[in-house]
Amino acid sequence: MVMNFVRNLFFFVLAILSSFWISSFWIAQTFTPSSSYQPVEVIDGAGLYKKQRTDGNEAYLQVIDLHKMQIDQLVGEVDDMGLGQGKYYQGEGKHYSPFFKMKLFNEVTDEYKELYSHTVFSLINCSFFEQYKSSTQLSFPIKFNGEVITGGHSPYGPVSQPADKFYSNIRLKALVWDDAGAYITDYDPATGAPLNESRVKNAIVSYQYSDHPAKVLGKNQANRFHVIGTLDFDGIKGDELLLIMTVNRATLDEAADLLRQLGVKGEIITIDGGSSTYLFNSRKGNIILPQPANQEDNPTFRKLPHYLGFRTRDKKPVSPLIKVSQPADKVQVEQNKPYLILWRDNLDSDVTIELYDGDKRIEVISPRTASNGVYEWTPKSPVKEGYSLRISSLKNRKIFGTLQL
């Protein structure tokens, strides 16, 4: 009997130790690329690596663990809503396609660091856009913290009269992410799926890398590109890793092949590249900068409308801030028509949105709404020139941002 007791106790302890070892093994595991990728910065939840390619050019790999990292969409304020101009959300002409302010990359980066301090890991440019002016429409739909903020306006896509017949029947792709992981799937412009699903809070629509006009119409020339894929590394259902490959000179096929070599088996998308390509890292600084083809002819080229920021979910206190920039041109707000109020904040509580005439409050637009940077407002009465919008912290009304109308 004593021997049975000892034996059972031994196996019980062994089972506990084995369970602990296995758990520790999986917890400790992190994705590490091959030795040809040299670490630039590696933190708990993210890594930036540099690869010197055989042709002398460079590739930068970012590995983002969505269980640990936050992705923020950073988009310029709206001056014109582009009502009825959306081409890719629930049918042509069924959604708006606003004009978003083009913002200088270093101003966006500086503001992001001001909001999130030491938690910032990196920034990249993101969405394709249509006009090289002070504000621009984005090419394809974006869902930002639960709100579809544009239906897209590109002529190079599956619309009734595309700029090139190749694009009549292509399948656009949606990159969807949340705290649990990310996936890339077919996008349906007729229904808006998957962006029309309430569970989807953040998503971008873009090209499968092989459908990018630079490959199809530009004969697949080498250039600067970002390509993005997802990867399951922890063995649990779903892809928790986002892999972003940024090349300073390569074809799209070569860039995508680098992701395949790292184990990406699913869809691979591309976002805006070429002269728009931007890559910033908190340790290294600006790695790849947007470049104008001709600074005199195209001074707005270094300004871009849409960025992605990556940061840790560190809860260390930072000074609470609400940041609002004045849109590029005069704001056009019309009675009974929607207008997107956009801002950035680092608050951990809700905000209130109010309409002011000077120091006089005219209307409470929303007594309480999430501090997520976006609110669609449809004014019920005429909005006079000179009115302003005020977004204030409910915890401390002295913390606010103002948008002049």
Regions found by a protein language model. Name each.
Residues L123-C126, I268-D272:
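Active-site neighborhood of phospho(di)ester-bond hydrolases with catalytic His/Asp-centered motifs
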Residues S24-F166, M245:
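Zymogen propeptides
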Residues F10-S23:
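Hydrophobic membrane-insertion alpha-helices, especially the h-region
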Residues M1-V13:
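N-terminal Sec-pathway targeting helices
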Residues N125-V216:
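Active-site-adjacent helix-turn-beta-strand microarchitecture at beta-sheet edges
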Residues G47-V63, L74, L195-D234:
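Conserved beta-alpha junction segments in alpha/beta enzyme cores
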Residues P320-L405:
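Extended, solvent-exposed regions of the mature portions of secreted/cell-surface glycoproteins
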Residues K133-V159, D211-T270, S276-V318:
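Conserved, well-ordered active-site substructure
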